[in-house]
Design a protein with these regions (language model features):
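Short, amphipathic alpha-helical interface elements at domain boundaries
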Residues: 1-55, 138-154
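Short, amphipathic alpha-helical "recognition" segments used to contact nucleic acids or chromatin
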Residues: 6-16, 175-189, 242-257, 295-307
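Short alpha-helical "recognition helix" segments of helix-turn-helix
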Residues: 24, 194-199, 262-264, 309-316
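Basic amphipathic alpha-helical segments that dock to polyanions
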Residues: 59-73, 212-214, 280, 331
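A short, conserved structural fragment
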Residues: 65-78, 219-220, 286, 332-335
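Accessory beta->alpha helical hairpin/"wing" motif in late/C-terminal subdomains of nucleic-acid enzymes
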Residues: 74-114
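Extended compositionally biased segments used for macromolecular assembly or nucleic-acid engagement
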Residues: 98-190
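Short Lys/Arg-enriched helix C-cap and helix-to-coil transition segments
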Residues: 217-234, 284-299, 335
Length: 335
């Protein structure tokens, strides 16, 4: 069993009841459907949400079949369920994941950072012609704007200092896994597979180790941005975490449109608009959204471990299901 199996089994085990492939895929890949956003919080797996955005459904299915053949998972009519008492270490090994909170930010930040390191290093080595390590045009545009009107020598020195501080202050367990991803001068950064082969570990250990350190750093930056001025400037806005449709709804809401007006303007079902507000509240815990229950009621609801929305409805009959979903995703903390 490798770290990917550990991740899959951990999510599955926390859900308690059988879960089908589409559900597991949306959680692991971080597809922000209304159901996925709600269930990730209901089953308290939001910290594990979206750690594998490039995951393919067929690949996940093949893994689940392997786990079934190994006797770790049972496949039932209602979905997959962990059927052994095997001890899992994913959360113990990686206690600081904040998957839902940093889902998009983590990957975009690291892409920005890798390209920034390459550009500044190549400038230092007077290397004018090279292939960008990141081909994404949005990332390239971000770094181009980031570099504008700045002294690149000063920038390079400051970035080096903050990277060194990252490794030192956060006591990064396996710094080589991070450092060897960077490119500059005549050195080309290694892939996850190349690093795994070099250090004789499985590739998923490298993958999750690097991602976990990025999440740890983002948490530190969020608490004390002034201590990481340059690295903080490479972190994309939290707004990028929202789906484009939810962002459109949020923009209308911030500009004074009420729920009915948004429904008319966007020509969407009210249930879809409600999904957007559930996603918005899950992303921004302080966001004011339509028909949000009061804070004391939200706290009361989230003091218990619920498995079904109808259980909450039975206990709080005056709330509709939209309000219940808002309360569920409002829970503070990442686990």
């Amino acid at each position: 069993m490798d770290k990917l199996d550990d991740y899959i089994l951990t999510v599955l085990k926390k859900c308690i009841t059988p879960r089908k492939l589409p559900f597991l895929y949306t959680i692991l890949a971080g597809r922000r459907t209304g159901q996925a956003v709600q269930d990730a919080h209901l089953f308290q797996v939001q910290h594990l949400f979206g750690l594998m955005p490039n995951l393919k459904s067929r690949f996940l299915e093949a893994r689940l079949i392997e786990l079934t053949d190994q006797g770790m998972v049972a496949s039932t009519e209602n979905g997959y369920i962990v059927q052994t008492d095997i001890e899992l270490f994913f959360e113990q090994d990686y206690p600081n994941f904040q998957g839902f909170a940093f889902q998009r930010q983590a990957f975009d930040f690291f892409a920005h950072l890798r390209l920034a390191v390459q550009v500044l290093s190549n400038k230092h080595h007077q290397k004018s012609y090279y292939l960008p390590i990141i081909r994404d045009k949005k990332v390239q545009g971000f770094i181009k704007n980031w570099l504008r009107n700045k002294d690149q020598t000063v920038l390079a020195n400051q970035l080096y200092e903050e990277l060194f501080e990252w490794i030192k202050k956060l006591n990064v367990a396996k710094p080589a896994f991070l450092i060897e991803r960077f490119s500059g001068g005549d050195l080309m950064g290694n892939t996850t597979e190349q690093i795994a082969a070099k250090y004789q570990v499985e590739k998923w250990e490298v993958y999750f180790e690097v991602l976990h350190e990025i999440h740890r750093l983002l948490a530190f930056i969020k608490k004390n941005p002034q201590d990481w001025a340059l690295l903080e400037s490479l972190v994309p806005s939290e707004i990028t975490a929202l789906t484009s449709s939810a962002l459109q709804t949020y923009t209308l809401w911030q500009n004074g449109a009420d729920l009915d007006t948004i429904e008319q303007i966007r020509n969407l079902k009210i249930s879809t608009i409600q999904d957007h507000f559930v996603e918005i509240r899950a992303t921004y815990k302080e966001a004011s959204v339509p028909y949000l229950p009061d804070e004391e009621l939200i706290k009361t609801i989230n003091q218990s471990n619920w498995r079904l929305l109808r259980e909450i409805k039975a206990a709080f009959p005056d709330l509709d299901y939209y309000q219940i979903r808002l309360a569920v995703v409002s829970k503070e903390g990442d686990k």
